[in-house]
Amino acid sequence: MNILTLLIFIPVLFGFIIMLLPSSLRSSFKYITLLATLLQLGMSIWIYLHFKTGVAYGGINHEDQFQFVQKLPWISLNLGSMGKMQIDYFVGIDGISITLLVMTSLVLVIAALSSWEIKSNLKGFFLLFLLLDMAVMGVFCSLDFFLFYLFYELMLLPLYFLIGMWGGARREYAAIKFFLYTLFGSVFMLLVMVGLYLSVTDPATGNHTFNMVQMMNPANYSAQSIFSIAGHQTILGMPARTVGFVVLFIAFAIKVPVVPLHTWLPDAHVEAPTPVSIILAGILLKIGGYGIIRICLGIFPEVATTGAFWLGLLGVISILYGAFNALAQRDLKRMIAYSSVSHMG
């Protein structure tokens, strides 16, 4: 089995073990979860030590520039005149994702250790924790946009329940606010994903594809497709590629979060249980930044270059706004939330 697949789905295996164990053994749930995260950390370190560097692995728009790749046919539908829809289970890593995999594995171990303080409904908590673990790892390894989107959305449900059920006094408010913010961005991300799918063809099959690596290569866009560079298509009077970049950027900026899309984070940090706060600060915000680098900059590089000043300005505003607000806080978690806004800026 591919080691990335094993890394992603190990939490599912341990989750099934927890699910099958009786409640009388609930004291063992935390040790099982810790073992799962330690195994992931060990595998991440092994992957890092065996990661190859050099000119041959430079770039992002060819599949052979990624490592530990596994590509399997997953969903295949005949859409008649629209052709065949092929969705692949496609995972692999490059220099960006390998660093984040190791960091994520370490943070998950720390979060698992901090879960010792959880006393109620242990089975539910650790099952949701492991589901979140799987989704996070899947995001960093996915090279198929549909698969990426699936893992990206899968993070939302466990986080919603972890905050809403084990959080503080205002946990329901914080959980719903987080859910609505993220859902708003996800709906628009879905629209751009479909547009990209209809714009890109796989040179090997001639069919439309969700393959993110193919989306990063301008040669794979149909001439008159909505996101073709040569097509110069417009949406509401604006260049279609600019609209696509902005919509995806907003979706990921909510997760970063970038000012003024940050207001869900202080509430979520304060109300979330400590293990979830660790994951929010240490992993979730980085996923937003990863999405901007991997997808926004990877698929729409010319738009990112043109708008570099405005992106930089947003970053500076987030840095200063987050820092000054962090200085004014007396609650430690709220201070960490605002400092995270500053750091991500």
Regions found by a protein language model. Give the residues of each.
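Short juxtamembrane and helix-loop transition motifs at transmembrane-helix boundaries
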Residues: M85-G92, V107-K119, F140, A240-V243, ...
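Hydrophobic/aromatic positions within or immediately flanking transmembrane alpha-helices
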Residues: I8, K30-T33, L101, F126, ...
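Alpha-helical multi-pass transmembrane bundles of energy-transducing inner-membrane proteins
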Residues: L25-R26, L131, A135-H232, L236, ...
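Central hydrophobic cores of alpha-helical transmembrane segments in multi-pass inner-membrane proteins
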Residues: T5-L20, L35-L49, L101-S115, L132-M134, ...
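Functional transmembrane alpha-helices
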Residues: P11, D94, D144-L162, I254-P301, ...
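Transmembrane helix-loop-helix hairpins at membrane boundaries of multipass inner-membrane proteins
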Residues: N2-I3, L21-L113, E117-L127, T209, ...
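Juxtamembrane/interfacial segments at transmembrane-helix boundaries in multi-pass membrane proteins
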Residues: K52-D88, F188-L261, I292-W310
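Residues that define the loop-to-transmembrane-helix transition and helix capping
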Residues: N2-T5, K30, K123, L143-L147, ...
